Swiss-Prot record:
Assembly behavior: Part of the ribosomal stalk of the 50S ribosomal subunit. Interacts with L10 and the large rRNA to form the base of the stalk. L10 forms an elongated spine to which L12 dimers bind in a sequential fashion forming a multimeric L10(L12)X complex.
Keyword field: Methylation, Ribonucleoprotein, Ribosomal protein, RNA-binding, rRNA-binding
A single BP term in Gene Ontology: translation
Protein name: Large ribosomal subunit protein uL11
GO molecular function, one term: large ribosomal subunit rRNA binding
Function summary: Forms part of the ribosomal stalk which helps the ribosome interact with GTP-bound translation factors.
A family per Pfam: Ribosomal_L11_N
Organism: Shewanella denitrificans (strain OS217 / ATCC BAA-1090 / DSM 15013)
Record note on modification: One or more lysine residues are methylated.
Length: 142
């Protein structure tokens, strides 16, 4: 018989640096999950990734307090800022542009995020990522 699912917990944790401090500790502690077990497993799974990259993770907690987790691709905003070599986006994206990014870089990001996105094809996902770039104050060039 399958285990009964108790809860889903969605977090964004920096790769290779999960620890019991907030937000990980309180979120897992409320559900009775072994926090250190999650931290060790997450850090082991993300050790090959760039250190400090924010990784969305969905933790499935079962009624016997066991868990499984699934890591996603980094947020599009993080990947766009990294591709444009910027620290942050614009506070006023309609009036203040902070940088430019090439369309082929946007397409590479869309292909990387394809597993987590719901677009019909790569072209639609590329347009979605372009919209994210514009909302951050980036200009998309050909």
């Amino acid at each position: 018989m399958a285990k009964k699912i108790e809860a889903y917990i969605k977090l964004q944790v920096k790769s290779g640096s999960a620890n019991p401090s907030p937000p990980v500790g309180p979120a897992l502690g409320q559900k009775g999950v072994n926090i250190m077990e999650f931290c060790k497993a997450f850090n082991a799974r993300t050790e090959k990734m760039e250190k400090g990259m924010p990784i969305p993770v969905v933790i499935t907690v079962y009624s016997d307090r066991s868990f499984t987790f699934e890591t996603k691709t980094p947020p599009a905003s993080y990947l766009l800022l990294k591709a444009a070599n910027l620290k942050s986006g614009s506070a006023r994206p309609n009036t203040v542009k902070v940088g430019t990014i090439k369309r082929n870089a946007v397409q590479e990001i869309a292909e990387l995020k394809a597993a987590d996105m719901t677009g019909a094809d790569v072209e639609a996902m590329t347009r979605t990522i372009e919209g994210t770039a514009r909302s951050m104050g980036l200009v998309v060039e050909d």
